[in-house]
Regions:
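Gly/Thr-rich phosphate-binding beta-strand-loop-beta motif of the actin/hexokinase/Hsp70
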Residues: 1-24, 113, 117-126
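Short hydrophobic/aromatic-rich motifs at helix boundaries and adjacent loops
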Residues: 14, 42, 81-84
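N-terminal phosphate-binding loop and adjacent alpha-helix
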Residues: 23-68
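Alpha-helix C-terminal capping segments
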Residues: 43-48, 76, 113-117
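Phosphate-binding/catalytic loop of phosphoryl-transfer enzymes
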Residues: 80, 92-126
Length: 126
């Protein structure tokens, strides 16, 4: 199982994804309210077996919230939690800008377009 997350300015969404890429659970909460205690309560209701998690990846535009979630999940799963911006993306996409200055949400949109077998329309309201 994988944990995937999107931390936006308003909302944070966390998904539990099966190995065949199906979303099995979704958790949504207000980003500004996040802290260790709230995460503990949310994940109790999420009913997740942390031993089954083998990868964690987040797309975040709020570094402070990502650090709180990363600390929580790393402690629970003993797995390193990655943020899209911190991955080596040069082999996936080439852009004429500093990757650190481009939002994670924009980078993931661009990466999704590299699949040349399908047509895409990406709507980004962020």
């Amino acid at each position: 199982m994988h944990i995937l997350g999107d931390i936006g300015n308003t909302e944070t969404k966390i998904f539990l994804v099966s190995l065949d890429n199906k979303i099995t659970k979704k958790l949504t909460f207000i980003t500004k309210d996040i802290n260790q205690i709230k995460l503990e309560k949310l994940f109790i209701n999420f009913k997740i077996d942390f031993k089954k998690i083998n990868k964690i990846l987040f797309c975040s535009v709020v570094p402070k919230s990502f650090n709180i979630i990363k600390k929580f999940l790393s402690k629970k799963t003993k797995i390193k939690c990655f943020e899209v911006k911190n991955l080596n993306l040069k082999s996936l996409i080439r852009i004429k800008a500093n990757y650190k200055q481009v939002g994670s949400d924009r980078l993931t949109n661009a990466i999704s377009l590299t699949n040349s077998q399908n047509n895409f329309i990406i709507l980004d309201f962020g």
